[in-house]
Amino acid sequence: ELELWKWDDEISQSRQKYEQIYRSREPQYVYHVDSKKCVLVAPSHMTNIYSPTCDEYNYVIIGDETPYRKLTDWRDGDAADYYLVSLETGDRKLVFPDLCERPVWSPNGKYVLFYHGKKKAWYKLEPVSGELTDISAAIGFPVYNEEHDLPKPANSYGIAGWMAEGNEVVLYD
C-alpha cells in the first residue's frame, strides 16, 4: 500500500489513519426553551468540551487543538487552547493557550482547575467572575514531578480529591 504525504499536512497520514478524533464534528449548541434562543457553544473544529458534573451550570470549557495539530507528532502530549464559554450568551474567553493537561471542574461547578506545565503551577478559575488565581504558590512544595527529565514541561502530581462540597481541593505534592 502506498501512502502519499505532504510536508505541510496538518495531521500526518499515519495519525489520520488511526485516530478518528480529528474528523470534523458537528458544532455543539444549547437551546434555551424559555427564550427560544439557540447558542453556539463549540464550533465543529473544537473537539473537546469539559462540563461540570453537577446538574445545573452556566459555563463550560472548550479545548481547541487546531493550532497544535502539526506539532502533535513532534511533541509529547496533545496541547490545546482552553476557552471559558457562557451557555447563556455563547461568549468565549481564552483562559490559557497551549496547555497539555486537561481542565478539572469542581463537583459543584463553581471552579475549574488548570495545571500550567511551563509555570509549574495550578490555577483556579472562577467562571462567574473570570478571576484566575495561582493556588499552588502558597503550598510551599512542588506540585509537579521533580524527577521529570524530558525536554517538555513537567506534569503535575495530580488532584487527590475535593472537600467541603467542592469548595476545597487537595493536590498531591
Predicted region positions:
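Beta-propeller folds
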Residues: 1-173
